[in-house]
Structure formats: structure tokens, C-alpha cells
Amino acid sequence: MRKIRLYIAISLDGWIAKPDGDVAWLDQIPTPEGEDYGYAEFYAGIDTTLMGFNTYREVLGFGIPFPYPDKTNYVFTRQTDQADTEHVKFITADPATFLRELRIGPGADIWLIGGGQLNSALLQHDLIDEMWVFVMPIVLGHGIPLFAPPLPEKQLTLLHHQTYPSGVTLLKYEPRS
């Protein structure tokens, strides 16, 4: 079965973006030359991405070509008038139902890009198999949370942790059985 893997950056106080969805604060984090925080290896292990519509709009606002053209990309939305694009399939179905089917199909692992609402929906339905959470050395004060409330209590098992010279800390978890 394919794994759904959350790979995401958060501020020390738990925000994935500013209230307006802006993630430019990530550019303030020093990244030593040649350090990709495991991204290349992670990206090579997935063939599908998942994101909510607000996250998709933020990605389009980066002013670069769509960054995942070599993957199958699903964007979850409540807007039924969205037409699929060259790189994106819009999904209006219930995320949990859709992803239960997708996981049992052929393919590599699946990257849950976010945002907070989709992260929360998948967590509530036990559909996140791994969480790669990169804690950035910055306090934002307010913003969009990693998981939108309400949330059930979930116990996690720490699989790996790593602190980088930049102050970024990776916490890799899986749900406790």
C-alpha cells in the first residue's frame, strides 16, 4: 500500500503560513549551500502530490512554472467549476474516500503538501502514514496552523530527528498503532 507522507515546514509556534497564506517567511531561514533538508530524496520517492485549493493558489503565486510537473497532482476543492489543467486534477469528492482508494492503487508514495484544512481532514481519518515536520527557527505569532481544529487526540511515534546547522530541526513521526 502506498504511504501518504506529510513533508512540511512550520514555525516554532506551529504555523505553516501567515494568515493570508504567504510562506515567504521561509526565505528568511538560512540554507547552507548544498543543503536541501532531504527534499531530493523525499521527492524521488513520491509520484503524487495532494494539496488544498488555498495551497494551490499560493503555489501558483510563486511566479515560477508549476513545480511538480513530473508528478500526478490532486487539488481538493469545494468549487465544482474548476477545470483540470495540464498538471493538476481538481477533486471535489470527500478527501478521505478518494484517498482510501488512491492508496491501494499502484504507484509510489504520496506527498501531502497541505494546507492545514486538508492535513486535519486526513489526520482525522488516519490517512497520514508519516509526518516529516521541519521546525524553523522563527516565531510568526499568528497564521495558518499545521492542523486546523477541531482535532482528535493522536499518539505519535518519533522515527527520526535531526538538527541542521541552520537551526532547522526535522521531526519525523508515524501514528502510534
Mark where each language-model region is.
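Enzymes that bind and transform nitrogen-containing heteroaromatic metabolites
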Residues: M1-S177
